[in-house]
Swiss-Prot record:
The lineage of its organism: Bacteria, Pseudomonadati, Thermodesulfobacteriota, Syntrophobacteria, Syntrophobacterales. NCBIfam families: ackA (TIGR00016). Catalyzes the formation of acetyl phosphate from acetate and ATP. Can also catalyze the reverse reaction. The gene is ackA. Belongs to the acetokinase family. It comes from the Bacteria. Its EC number is 2.7.2.1. This is Acetate kinase. Keywords: ATP-binding, Cytoplasm, Kinase, Magnesium, Metal-binding, Nucleotide-binding, Transferase. Mg(2+) binds at N7, E387.
Amino acid sequence: MRVIVVNSGSSSIKYEVFALDDCSTLVDGLLERIGTRNARFKRRWLTDSGHWEEMEETRPIADHHEGFRFLLDAAVRYPTTRVAPGAFFGFGHRVVHGGEVFHEPVIVDDEVVRRIKDLIPLAPLHNPANVAAIEALRLIRPDVPNVAVFDTAFHQSMPPKAFLYALPHELYREHHVRRYGFHGTSHRYVAGEAARHLGLPEDYANLITLHLGNGASATAVQGGRSIDTSMGLTPLEGLIMGTRCGDLDPAVHFYISRKTGRSSEELEAMMNKESGLKGICGTNDMREIQRRSADGDARAQLAFEMFCYRIRKYIGSYSAALGRVDAIVFTGGIGENSAPVRRECCDGLRNLGVVLDHRRNEEDWSGLHEIQREDSPVKILVIPTDEEREIARQTIQTIRRAGVAGGARNQ
């Protein structure tokens, strides 16, 4: 039996097939340009000999429903007995926004679909595609349970002092204006991996997890629970990101509008798509920023310093919130691969018990590794995130608790 994890976008479907017994990856793939006559399908599968093979093809795919029919058919037709046709145990879906309704993964039924649709105003770019995937798979394979795993769920443990804004309370009561946080599946995954590596019970470990990619967020994890996180009502708040500005004086919006005549929609687009690293130096690619900075580009150096300075401030803030910090965890594309970013974020934090080993930080590693000096009271860990595997784990756990595993054989 196997689990299929789905991450559905407005014109794409990313998926991964996991073995039920050990959550190992058997197949992964991407279907993009849905709605066109030249949709591109890329897939990779594990052969009996333990090697990966891959292929790519182009074909017309009208919509998500047709896309999922094609993917499910392809999922049972790989030339390897490792993924020979068998029962689907379940489908796990990444859903971006669960609001205050969903604190944990849930088996999808009509009521769950309705509630996810009700939350579309909080995530208008993501929840519609997530719902489309759920509805398509429920229609195509009604015998297989679907599980919704929410990016926001991990942060629902934040206390009111952390998630409320200092605004008139009726805005929260009537319109749900509050901090929700995102990247929760990634933060949950690396927090669990860190606790296991440190030999600490998850309900004891105090961690600062840093998911650094084109989107970036920090989370304070106390005893396995998120008690604060940098993103807010939307992913725009918090750290400087590839194209998002992060924390900003709200009056900046009004000032720019008065000076330029830009509408609120134009300002929202600018702060989400044209700001952050891209706004400072013209690119959101940290690798290019580091190359240009090394060549003496002042704007690139400024972007690099601003990015890391904001992270350092959050490390200090969350150290105060946690009281005791067992480890700082770097993950995400930048967090896992940029030694200069990790160095700039950690250097000068000795007073917080953070002492980086520069040699270990620069070495090439694979998998989880420590980069602190031996005398550092706080561990510094680099942990590759695996949101799809975490969704698979949560899907399996949720289905087993509910006792509703799919049992029909694939045709």
